[in-house]
Amino acid sequence: MNNTHEKDRDIISSSQIGQDLWVIDTLNFKRNGYFLDLGALDGTTHSNSAMLERKYGWNGICVEANPDVFPMLSSNRECMCVNSLLDSVNNEIKEFHCANELSYVENENRNMTLEQLKLLLLQKNMPYKSILMKTR
């Protein structure tokens, strides 16, 4: 999928693979919809909901666990923004690795080891830290 839509050439997607374009196309250019964007980062980089909010009048909630990028999310978006780590189990303490768009929750099933992540971030001169967070 390319990053513009045949019916509306003014649409430019900021999502990684055109997820927002798929939503608009599937819902026939629906206006005033509602979204829940989990892992919203700064609200613009690779955003699946920014275009829906700005061009189509959608409202919703952006959730971002990384406390380092959350202030940017809050300033970049009009919708409700929540700094929280969501999980299927409430009130568990989980280790969250803060690494911009590569952030993730510690678990035994991840494909990339922590050492590989740290090396990648070092090569790209990107910050990294690990924090404990309570799930919601």
Each model region followed by its residue ranges:
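Phosphate/nucleotide-binding beta-alpha loop and adjacent structural elements of enzyme active sites
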Residues: 1-136
